[in-house]
């Protein structure tokens, strides 16, 4: 495998600018938002537009964040407001559709379990009785949209929010007439232009497992190798299976989804990680959407035609 610097799950390795005939000077705007490091790379002349894109990220963070007590979602979960605004409601509806699609393996009502596991701080796994108690306060079927009701649950949009925001950013850049953009929202990558993108190995930090060529699309990777703790030789990670209330235990070590719709790619990367290689068939429900799975055994499984379509090369 080829050694690389950094540990992002997806790495835009090289930009190809055919329209201009040569590569222009580039600028990258970096910020901490959406509970992660984000970067937006554009031609240098478009730097101010990239800075405005960061402001757009922060606007949506005030809608969808679970860690900001003033966000619209936090106030909805806390009962301070009873009905979400149009964009929050739309994203909740999208999340519910994926919950139904996976028969509840993917579930946007896992806030109590997310809080219980608290991967950033926890050193030992919770007791089974604690997990059972948290599960009693979950269940996507309890949420209704008309009239709106959480049904005693709390919403966590962590598996769809960054994808939704990436779609909004693409719309913004298109409206501004800006091309040749890489938006990296912590592993959710929106590409406007043609790029070679690297997929990080889930087994060795800083190494590429594969590279692929992408054009005007989105790529999202989910894996268990960045946010986790270990206890008694067992790794406990942040991707939870709603059916068990515990860390997902499929055959997947890493999942990458490519789709023109970033919110679909975001949700599917999590859903397929939970379901494992059997979940690859979910991509057939969505136009021009493909996925690859690096299994725990080091095998590479993809949707049909993935390697040819994206000029995939295993390192």
Give the ranges of each region predicted by the language model:
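Mature catalytic core of soluble alpha/beta enzymes
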Residues: 2-315
């Amino acid at each position: 495998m080829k050694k690389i610097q950094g540990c992002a799950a997806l790495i835009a390795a090289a930009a190809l600018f055919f329209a201009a005939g040569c590569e222009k000077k580039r600028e990258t705007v970096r910020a901490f938002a959406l509970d992660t490091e984000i970067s937006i790379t554009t031609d240098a002349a478009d730097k101010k537009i990239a800075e405005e894109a960061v402001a757009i990220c922060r606007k949506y963070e005030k809608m969808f964040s679970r860690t900001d007590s003033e966000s619209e979602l936090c106030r909805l979960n806390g009962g301070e407001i009873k009905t979400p605004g149009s964009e929050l409601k739309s994203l909740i509806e999208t999340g519910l559709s994926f919950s139904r699609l996976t028969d509840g393996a993917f579930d946007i009502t896992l806030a109590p379990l997310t809080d219980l596991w608290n991967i950033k701080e926890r050193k030992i796994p919770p007791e089974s009785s604690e997990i059972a108690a948290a599960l009693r306060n979950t269940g996507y079927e309890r949420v209704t949209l008309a009239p709106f009701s959480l049904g005693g649950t709390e919403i966590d949009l962590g598996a769809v929010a960054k994808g939704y925001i990436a779609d909004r950013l693409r719309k913004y850049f298109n409206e501004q007439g800006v091309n040749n953009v890489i938006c990296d929202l912590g592993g959710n990558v929106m590409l406007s232009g043609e790029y070679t993108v690297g997929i990080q190995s889930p087994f060795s930090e800083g190494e590429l497992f594969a590279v692929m060529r992408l054009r005007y699309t989105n790529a999202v990777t989910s894996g268990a190798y960045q946010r986790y703790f270990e206890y008694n030789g067992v790794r406990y990670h942040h991707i939870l299976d709603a059916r068990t209330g515990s860390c997902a235990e499929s055959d997947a070590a890493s999942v990458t989804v490519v789709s023109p719709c970033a919110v679909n790619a975001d949700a599917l990367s999590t859903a397929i990680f939970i379901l494992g290689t059997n979940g690859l068939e979910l991509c057939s429900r969505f136009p021009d959407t493909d996925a690859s799975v690096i299994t725990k055994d080091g095998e590479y499984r993809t949707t049909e035609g993935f390697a040819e379509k994206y000029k995939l090369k295993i390192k």
